[in-house]
């Protein structure tokens, strides 16, 4: 994309953190910190009272209209949410490089943006953001923007607001026949917001079919790679990863492989927390790390869940079996773990 598409341009800020979380190497954050700061400062010059109003919005969102610019969700809502996200990443970076002044300054800026976002887009009487579309509600939920300021001006999470907005999100998905209406931008936030709140069964329902919008519909028409539009007959590219955001759910939730919550360790310590869903009986995946290949497969039959795990040398896996609260910590080697399902 050209400049001024915040949802794409913030890759300057996100990629160094993805690298850090994956490899435990913070060198890119330190190297590109000045660039991150300049980009945020640029966005600040384009904002009007904390609101950004340019970009593509939820590009290629789904509905009874020609795909393209955002139709279901206001462009300023999408742009401002990503503005907030960018600043929050910069705050993390400022802390890591030891810049106390920037930490305070950009924390204050982030709070101002969140206040402006909620003032502009939150309908408190209905607990809906923007138009109430799936992207409108999923973005602030994902970014934990459902907050209120206390008497001292400090922002804290509003659990009641979060629950009401999330309930509205679920209702909208169900009202559309367990189908999404999000686009290239909103897909990830919808899927991950549902996953973070334990709605894995709903995610499975949303994609385990052969209708549009869905991957099965593309397969019906012979697609061997993801197509740019949910209905490949509509033209556009037949080799476009744009709608591939479910891949994150496949690895992080369905198979359950994800890095430790202590990012500095990269995958020297990692989590395996599989989420069996629906009538799915078998899942298998592998993930290449600096330390070797993580192999995971599971079966779910006759009320028994069987997990096979291969842990690379000099690494540790923290395994959460379905329905069990206490994890099992295992060292390098090959294991089979069984539990009731």
Task: Show which residues each predicted segment covers.
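Short, small-residue-biased leader/transition segments that mark boundaries at the very start
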Residues: 1-7
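Alpha-helical transmembrane segments of multipass membrane proteins
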Residues: 18-19, 90
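Catalytic cores of carbohydrate-active enzymes
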Residues: 44-64, 72-238, 334
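Short loop-to-helix capping motifs
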Residues: 25-26, 99
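Non-catalytic C-terminal accessory modules of carbohydrate-active enzymes
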Residues: 201-341
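Carboxylate/His-rich catalytic cores and anion/metal-binding grooves
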Residues: 32-44
């Amino acid at each position: 994309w050209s400049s001024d598409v915040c949802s794409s341009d913030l890759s300057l800020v996100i990629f160094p953190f993805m690298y850090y979380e994956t490899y435990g190497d913070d060198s890119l954050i330190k190297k590109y910190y000045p660039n991150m700061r300049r980009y945020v400062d640029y966005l600040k010059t384009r904002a009007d009272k904390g609101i950004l109003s340019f970009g593509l919005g939820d590009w290629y969102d789904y509905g009874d209209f020609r795909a393209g610019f955002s139709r279901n969700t206001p462009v300023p809502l999408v742009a401002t949410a990503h503005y907030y996200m960018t600043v929050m990443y910069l705050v993390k970076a400022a802390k890591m490089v030891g810049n106390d002044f920037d930490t305070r300054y950009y924390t204050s800026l982030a709070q101002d943006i969140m206040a402006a976002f909620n003032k502009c887009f939150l309908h408190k009487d209905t607990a809906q953001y923007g138009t109430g579309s799936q992207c409108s509600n999923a973005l602030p939920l994902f970014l934990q923007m459902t907050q209120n300021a206390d008497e001292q001006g400090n922002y804290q999470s509003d659990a009641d607001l979060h629950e009401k907005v999330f309930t509205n999100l679920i209702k909208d998905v169900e009202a559309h026949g367990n189908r999404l209406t999000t686009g290239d931008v909103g897909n990830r936030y919808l899927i991950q917001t549902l996953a973070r709140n334990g709605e894995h069964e709903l995610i499975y329902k949303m994609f385990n079919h052969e209708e549009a919008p869905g991957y099965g519909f593309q397969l019906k028409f012979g697609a061997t790679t993801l197509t740019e539009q949910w209905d490949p007959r509509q033209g556009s590219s037949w080799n476009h990863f744009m709608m591939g955001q479910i891949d994150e759910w496949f690895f992080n939730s369905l198979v359950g492989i994800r890095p430790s919550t202590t990012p500095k360790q990269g995958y020297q310590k990692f989590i395996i927390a599989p989420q069996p869903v629906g009538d799915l009986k078998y899942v298998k995946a592998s993930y290449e790390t600096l330390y070797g290949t993580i192999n995971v497969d599971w079966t779910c039959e006759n009320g028994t869940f069987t997990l096979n795990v291969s842990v690379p040398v000099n690494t540790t896996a923290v395994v959460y079996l379905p329905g069990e609260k206490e994890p099992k910590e295992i060292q390098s080697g090959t294991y089979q773990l069984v539990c009731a399902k």
